[in-house]
Amino acid sequence: MNIIVTANTVPFIHGGADYHIEGLIEELKIRGHQVESIRFPFRFNPDSELVNLMAFCESQNYTCPNGKMVDRIISLQFPAYGVNHPNHVIWLMHQHREAYDLYPNDPTSEQTVLRDQIVDYDNRTISAAAKVYANSICVSERLQKFNQINSVPLYHPPYAWKQFYNQESQDFIFFPSRLEQLKRQGLLIEAAQHLESPVKIIIGGSGGQGNAYQAKIDTLDLADKVRLIGRFSEQEKFTYYAQCLAVFFAPKDEDYGYITLEAMLSSKPVITCTDSGGPLEFVEDQVTGYVCDPDPKAIARVIDKLYADKQKAKSMGQAGHRKYHAANVSWDNVIETLLGPL
């Protein structure tokens, strides 16, 4: 097939979304398809930038650009899914959450106008697609709740999924993620002051909250318990996963979350929270990890439990590894689904 993948690009910001986009393109090419990607430059302010980009995307028809027939469009992100094609499949990473679950309680009149424009755009363009998939149950439920649009959850593997491995655990908890408020590294930092065990905390990644988190560590006198290691290589990532006692991943209402899957591929238990969204689709309390309240003391208690019973920690990690493979999280399934009959 001749396939176009549409998505966004944000200069100088690279993360899980890029792995998702690039992974899909690579897997399509491996299977012999001709693939082009069209990535629209995304700017979230001023508001006029979003409005203009929505209008531009919706004006694009890729049925036969420059006389070249396109068999299928696969769109991944807002507002890139506004493009037109009769065989258009949307595989939704997430919508523009600031117009939905992250919409402020006391919006300005400008925010209300923009929100209405985005909701109208989503209702119109997503409904026009031949098929709609979501990258998790969480995203699918959000789309149904706010837009009354049905979608089918479709899981995919994390980047370099074959390279994760397991080693004997050491006494540290690993949390790799962007340092942002929604990822809630602060919960784990605050939990460290309540630990009774000698377990250390290693937090990897960079982001806008880096200085604030370091200040919190210093203020709480936790320099001997918590380390911010900043950016790390892929090989370092695999090693941290392989050697940790457990992985902490408790964002607020996460869309999907590669970190959960990476931990399971490394046969490590996952600590998450009751309001974390995507991770809850894989983490079963006391089976593949722990699901606790988003409270530092509750988090500290389960970390101490893991230290006190390392055999149980190992068993939960192995259960997570089995659960991952039982869920058919594979690119074969993804490609077969996205290119199936419409």
Regions found by a protein language model. Give the residues of each.
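Aromatic "clamp/platform" in nucleotide-sugar-dependent glycosyltransferases that forms part
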Residues: 252
